Regions:
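Solvent-exposed interaction patches of small proteins and small membrane subunits
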Residues: 2-128
Length: 128
């Protein structure tokens, strides 16, 4: 075989753009996982929600995963329902949970965010 023929034979195909429906399906699947985590937290109740408890860690994962979704460029077209103020609050809460530690977290505000505010955001995202 000639060198030119080998190059053409093994040339990579151009990447195809992922379909928007595939992105939407992936987003919906992740939103369902976040919702399931919220249900776990809510089912245990506020009295069992504090640093050191499993539900507190699950709630942190809710915020971490939601913040990650907001940072993914392929999901950006679907994120119009999330206000800039909400995005900032989610990022700030994620940073406290992931980097600063729970001691600086206000448990009452964190409970409210995970059990009321985030579900409202998820409802808006699912409606799009």
């Amino acid at each position: 075989m000639s060198e030119g023929h080998d190059q053409a034979r093994f040339a990579p195909r151009p990447r195809r753009q992922a379909s928007n429906s595939h992105d939407r399906a992936n987003l919906d699947a992740e939103l369902e996982l976040i919702r399931a985590r919220i249900d776990t937290v809510t089912a245990r109740g506020r009295e069992d929600f504090h640093d050191g408890k499993e539900t507190y860690d699950v709630a942190c994962m809710v915020i971490i995963r939601l913040a990650a979704l907001l940072e993914r460029p392929e999901f950006e077209p679907h994120m119009e329902a999330v206000t800039q103020k909400e995005r900032l609050a989610i990022r700030t809460t994620r940073n406290i949970a992931a980097h600063t530690g729970y001691r600086s977290m206000n448990d009452d505000l964190f409970w409210l965010a995970v059990t009321q505010r985030v579900p409202a955001i998820l409802d808006r995202l699912r409606g799009r």
